[in-house]
Amino acid sequence: MLTGQRVEEIARLHVDNWDAEESIIDWSKTKNGAPHAIPVPPTAAELIESIKPNEYGWFFPSAKDPKRPVSHGTLYSFMWRQRDRGVIPVVTNRDLRRTWKTLAGQAGVPKEIRDRIQNHALHDVSSKSYDRWNYMREKRAGMAKWDKFVRAMLAKKRRLKLVA
């Protein structure tokens, strides 16, 4: 939710994909087949840095085979169990991306940059054939707006808890 990425892409996070110094996740395999790199906002980077990868470099290893990442099926099953127990609301993993897209827009991140952060295929001729810019600077600016928005929401929630 903090990065707007597909749950299964985050689940496959490996030390080889994470550049802690630059706070960038760089994937070579993605759903649309295109390489994809995103700047990670500070709130998410802090969480990633708090996770100790296993001996094979996976941040989220499979419980059955630690040489592999957790499967998307395991993640979906976990979500369903949590919903059935009333721990989380009835949402799907896709809802997380949809919510990110909506709230990032509310935070002031332009739609084109949200699309690029989420690695949505751009179908216009210019994007497909001519534009080779990686948009990292623009994605980083968008993620900075998003991080500021998230931190403000979390601070507001904390203040409400203190009052209650």
What do these predicted regions represent?
Residues 1-8, 102-106:
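Short pre-functional
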Residues 3-50, 121-125:
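Conserved tyrosine-mediated DNA breakage-rejoining catalytic core shared by Y-recombinases
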Residues 12, 77, 103, 116:
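DNA-binding alpha-helical recognition surfaces that contact promoter or target DNA
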Residues 16-24, 88-90, 109-130, 152-161:
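Short, polar N-cap/turn motifs at the start of nucleic acid-interacting alpha helices
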Residues 27-33, 45, 66, 118-155:
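Catalytic-site neighborhood detector that most strongly recognizes the C-terminal catalytic loop/helix
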Residues 39-89, 95, 100, 108, ...:
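Active-site/catalytic core of tyrosine-dependent DNA strand-transfer enzymes
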Residues 40, 101-104, 114, 130, ...:
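Hydrophobic, well-ordered secondary-structure elements that form the walls
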